[in-house]
C-alpha cells in the first residue's frame, strides 16, 4: 500500500483514499481476474479506509454526525443517500431518491433524522424507516439551515424570500423578505441565533429570528477589480463575534461583527467561487480556517492570512467536511470515489481509525528511482552542443526544471554523432586511469616516493610535524583543502606583521637559533665526578687541567678580544667533548663486558680435578676416593656432575642410629645450642622460654597437642 503525500512548510498532507489512490472492483470481477490482478500494481496498492466510500458517478454533499460515529453523503447517478458507519468502516445503507440533492442537514445527533433539499423544489424528511414526509417550496431552493432554539427550518431560494418552516407546528411561517433577489447561502450563529443570508449581489443581510426583522446589511467591497460578484457562502465562528464569507471571484472576507471593515481579505488564487468555509477551533493548532473552491482547499491563519496547508485533488470539489477534533477531512467531488485527507499536525486520527497514526509514515509515497532510469538529464547548453534545438517542445525532449530529459539510448547515439571520437577518448582516459592506479599499488623504494613540495610556510609544517607527527603533516600537505596554503605565495605567513606579533609576542627558545645551541644537555654532578675520577686514574686529569690553565693564561689577550658569543660557544664545545668522552667510555665498558662473557666457559669436572690434583699427593687422592665410595654405599646416594659444573645429588633419607658416636656428639652439640650456649660459652638470648601469664590462651593450631 502507498499513501500519496505532499509537504509544504513542514506540514505533511496524506491522501488516504480517492482518485489515483484506491481502486475497487466488484467481487465477481476480482475473483474472475484474480491472476491478472496479481500483476496490477495499482490494484494491489489500493487503500480502502472505508469500504464502498464512493458513488456511481459523483458526490454532491457530505456531512459528519454530531456524535462523530456516522457520515452521510449524497450523490448521483442515480440520486441516492449513503450512510457510513465508522465503527465498522463500511457502508451502513443506501437509499435512492426521486431527485438530485442540493443541500441537506442532520437534525439528530446521529443519522436517524435528516432534511434534504432537492433540485425539484421538494424538501424530504428522512428517518430510520426511510422517507418520512415530503413538501415543496415555491421556488428552487439553494441552501437550508436549522435553528435548534425555535425549531425553524430556513430555506434560501432563487427569489427574494427566505422561507421558514416550523418543524414543531408542522407548517410554513411568513417568510423573511429581502431587498435583493436570490439567496445563495444561509447560516446561523449558534451562540446568539443571528441569521446571515448571502445574496446574489455583494450584500449580506443579517436577521434576528426573535424579532423577525432585519438587523443590518453588510456591503462587501471589491478593491481589486470593478466586476460584479456574489456572496456564495457564509459562516459564523463559535465565539459569536467573528464572521466570514466567500465570493464568486475567489475571495474570502473575515469580519468582526462590531465593525464593517474586513480584518483579512484572502485570495484563493484561482478565481472560482468559494464553496465552503470551516473554522478549525477544536484542533491542535489555533486560529486556522479552511476555504474551499472547486480546485483546492486551503488552510490558513485567520489573523495574518499566512498559508498553512492545502488539499488539491485531481478532480473538482463539490463539498468538504472536517471530522471534529481530528486532522481528517472528507471531500465530495466529481469522481466515483470520495477523497479522504489526513493532516497529523492539525490533530490525531479519529478513534475508529487510530491505526492511521502509526502507518502514515510507513505507507508514505517514496520517490521512485526507476521513473527516469531510462532517461538522462541534459541542460540547454547540452542541447545546443548536441544540435537538438529543433526537438525542443516535442516528446523526445521532456522539459524539466532548467533542462530536459532524453532517452539514454538516443543520447548515446546523438553524442556519438556530435563527437565521433568520444568513445576513443573515453577509452584512452580509462586505460590511463587504470595504469596510474596500478602504478600507485606497486611497492616503491624510499627514494622513489614523491614528497609533497613545500614552497611557503615551511616553519608551519615543522611545527605541525613536531606536535602531531610527520604522518599528520603529510596528510595536511596532500589534502586538497590545505595544500594551496603551502604552494601559493598569497598564503605566506608574514611574521613581521603587527597582527602576527600581537598573537605571538614571544618566541620559544626552541624556535630560535641561539636556543638550538643552548639545548645541549649539561652533565650532571655524578657524571662530572665519574669523568674526573676516570681522568685521574688514567693519569691525564692533572695534566689536562694544567694545560688548560696554561693555555688560558697565554691566551688572555685573545679571549679579551673575543665576543661573548664565542665564549659561550667554547663552553658548549667543552661540554660536548665531555659528553662524547663519556659516551665512548660507556661504549668501551659494554664491549669489554660482552667479550668477557663470551670467553668465559664453565669447566668440566675432570678439568677441575686435574687442577686440584696437581697440589695433592697420590695417597690423599686415593683416600678421598675411598671415602666417597664408602659414603655412596652407606648413604645409597648418587652424585652426578655435568659439563658446566652443575651437580645432581640423589639419596634416600634415613634416620640416624643412636649407637653412632657421631650422632651422640652431634646431638650433644645440638643440645648445647638448644640450651642457649654459643661457641664462646656465653648464653644465647633465644627469647622467652615460659609464658608471661599462666593459663593464657594460645593461638597455635597445636594448642592441644600436649593434652
From Swiss-Prot:
One of its GO terms (cellular component) is small-subunit processome. The modification Phosphoserine is found at residues 529, 550, 555. Keywords: Nucleus, Phosphoprotein, Repeat, Ribosome biogenesis, rRNA processing, WD repeat. Residues 523-707 are annotated as: Disordered. WD repeats lie at residues 54-94, 178-217, 226-265, 269-310, 312-351. GO terms for biological process: maturation of SSU-rRNA from tricistronic rRNA transcript (SSU-rRNA, 5.8S rRNA, LSU-rRNA); ribosomal small subunit biogenesis. It is found in: Nucleus, Nucleolus. The keyword DNA damage does not apply. Pfam families: Beta-prop_NOL10_N, NOL10_2nd, NUC153. It comes from the Eukaryota. The keyword rRNA processing applies. Residues 545-558 have a biased composition (Acidic residues). Residues 532-544, 559-598, 629-647, 659-671, 680-697 have a biased composition (Basic and acidic residues). May be involved in rRNA-processing and ribosome biosynthesis. Component of the 90S pre-ribosomes. Belongs to the WD repeat NOL10/ENP2 family. PANTHER family: NUCLEOLAR PROTEIN 10 (PTHR14927:SF0). This is Ribosome biogenesis protein ENP2. The lineage of its organism: Eukaryota, Fungi, Dikarya, Ascomycota, Saccharomycotina.
Amino acid at each position: 500500500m502507498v499513501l500519496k503525500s505532499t509537504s509544504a512548510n513542514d506540514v505533511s498532507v496524506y491522501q488516504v483514499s480517492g482518485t489515483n489512490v484506491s481502486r475497487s472492483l466488484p467481487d465477481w470481477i476480482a475473483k474472475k481476474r484474480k491472476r491478472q490482478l496479481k500483476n496490477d500494481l495499482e490494484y494491489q496498492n489500493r487503500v480502502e479506509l472505508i469500504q464502498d466510500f464512493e458513488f456511481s458517478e459523483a458526490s454532491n454533499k457530505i456531512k459528519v454526525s454530531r456524535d462523530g460515529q456516522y457520515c452521510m453523503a449524497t450523490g448521483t447517478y442515480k440520486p441516492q443517500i449513503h450512510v457510513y458507519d465508522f465503527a465498522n468502516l463500511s457502508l451502513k445503507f443506501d437509499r435512492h431518491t426521486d431527485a438530485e440533492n442540493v443541500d441537506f442537514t442532520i437534525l439528530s445527533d446521529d443519522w436517524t433524522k435528516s432534511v434534504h433539499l432537492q433540485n425539484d423544489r421538494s424538501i424530504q424528511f428522512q428517518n430510520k424507516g426511510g422517507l418520512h414526509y415530503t413538501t415543496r417550496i415555491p421556488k428552487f431552493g439553494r441552501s437550508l439551515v436549522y435553528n435548534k432554539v425555535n425549531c425553524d427550518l430556513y430555506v434560501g431560494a432563487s427569489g427574494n424570500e427566505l422561507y421558514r418552516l416550523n418543524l414543531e407546528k408542522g407548517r410554513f411561517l411568513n417568510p423573511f423578505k429581502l431587498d435583493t433577489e436570490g439567496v445563495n447561502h444561509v447560516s446561523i450563529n449558534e451562540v446568539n441565533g443571528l441569521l446571515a443570508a448571502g445574496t446574489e449581489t455583494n450584500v449580506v443581510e443579517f436577521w434576528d429570528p426573535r424579532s423577525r426583522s432585519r438587523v443590518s446589511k453588510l456591503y462587501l467591497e471589491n478593491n481589486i477589480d470593478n466586476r460584479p460578484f456574489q456572496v456564495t457562502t457564509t459562516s459564523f465562528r463559535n465565539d459569536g463575534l467573528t464572521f466570514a464569507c466567500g465570493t464568486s471571484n475567489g475571495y474570502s472576507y473575515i469580519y468582526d461583527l462590531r465593525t464593517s471593515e474586513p480584518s483579512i481579505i484572502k485570495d484563493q488564487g484561482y478565481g472560482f467561487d468559494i464553496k465552503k468555509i470551516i473554522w478549525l477551533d477544536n484542533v491542535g493548532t489555533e486560529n486556522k480556517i479552511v476555504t474551499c473552491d472547486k480546485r483546492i482547499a486551503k488552510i490558513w491563519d485567520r489573523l495574518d492570512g499566512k498559508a498553512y496547508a492545502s488539499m488539491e485533488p485531481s478532480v473538482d470539489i463539490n463539498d468538504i467536511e472536517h471530522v471534529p477534533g481530528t486532522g481528517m477531512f472528507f471531500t465530495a467531488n466529481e469522481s466515483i470515489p470520495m477523497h479522504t485527507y489526513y493532516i497529523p499536525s492539525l490533530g490525531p486520527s479519529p478513534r475508529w481509525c487510530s491505526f492511521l497514526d502509526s502507518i502514515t509514515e510507513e505507507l508514505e509515497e517514496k520517490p521512485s528511482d526507476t521513473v527516469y532510469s531510462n532517461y538522462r538529464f541534459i541542460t540547454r547548453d547540452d542541447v545546443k552542443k548536441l544540435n537538438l534545438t529543433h526537438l525542443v517542445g516535442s516528446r523526445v525532449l521532456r522539459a524539466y526544471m532548467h533542462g530536459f530529459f532524453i532517452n539514454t539510448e538516443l543520447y548515446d547515439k546523438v553524442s556519438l554523432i556530435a563527437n565521433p571520437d568520444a568513445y576513443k577518448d573515453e577509452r584512452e582516459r580509462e586505460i590511463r586511469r587504470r595504469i596510474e592506479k596500478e602504478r600507485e599499488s606497486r611497492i616503491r623504494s624510499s627514494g622513489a616516493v614523491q614528497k609533497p613540495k613545500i614552497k611557503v610556510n615551511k616553519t608551519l609544517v615543522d611545527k605541525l610535524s613536531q606536535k602531531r607527527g610527520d604522518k599528520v603533516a603529510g596528510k595536511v600537505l596532500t589534502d586538497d583543502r590545505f595544500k594551496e596554503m603551502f604552494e601559493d605565495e598569497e598564503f605566506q605567513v608574514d611574521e613581521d606583521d603587527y597582527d602576527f606579533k600581537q598573537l605571538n609576542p614571544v618566541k620559544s627558545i626552541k624556535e630560535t637559533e641561539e636556543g638550538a645551541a643552548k639545548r645541549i644537555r649539561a652533565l650532571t654532578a655524578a657524571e662530572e665526578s665519574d669523568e674526573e675520577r676516570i681522568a685521574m686514574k688514567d693519569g691525564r686529569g692533572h695534566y689536562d687541567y694544567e694545560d688548560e690553565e696554561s693555555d688560558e693564561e697565554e691566551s688572555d689577550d685573545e679571549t679579551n678580544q673575543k665576543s661573548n658569543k664565542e665564549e659561550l660557544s667554547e663552553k658548549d664545545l667543552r661540554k660536548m667533548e665531555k659528553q662524547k668522552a663519556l659516551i665512548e667510555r660507556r661504549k668501551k665498558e659494554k664491549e669489554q663486558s660482552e667479550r668477557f662473557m663470551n670467553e668465559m666457559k664453565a669447566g668440566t669436572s675432570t678439568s677441575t680435578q686435574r687442577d686440584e690434583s696437581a697440589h695433592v699427593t697420590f695417597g690423599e687422592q686415593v683416600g678421598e676416593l675411598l671415602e666417597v665410595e664408602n659414603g655412596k654405599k652407606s648413604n645409597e646416594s648418587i652424585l652426578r656432575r655435568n659439563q658446566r659444573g652443575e651437580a645432581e645429588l640423589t639419596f634416600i633419607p634415613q634416620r640416624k642410629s643412636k649407637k653412632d658416636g657421631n650422632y651422640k656428639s652431634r646431638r650433644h652439640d645440638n643440645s648445647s645450642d638448644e640450651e642457649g650456649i654459643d661457641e664462646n660459652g656465653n648464653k644465647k638470648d633465644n627469647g622467652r622460654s615460659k609464658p608471661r601469664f599462666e593459663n593464657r590462651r594460645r593461638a597455635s593450631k597445636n594448642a592441644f597437642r600436649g593434652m
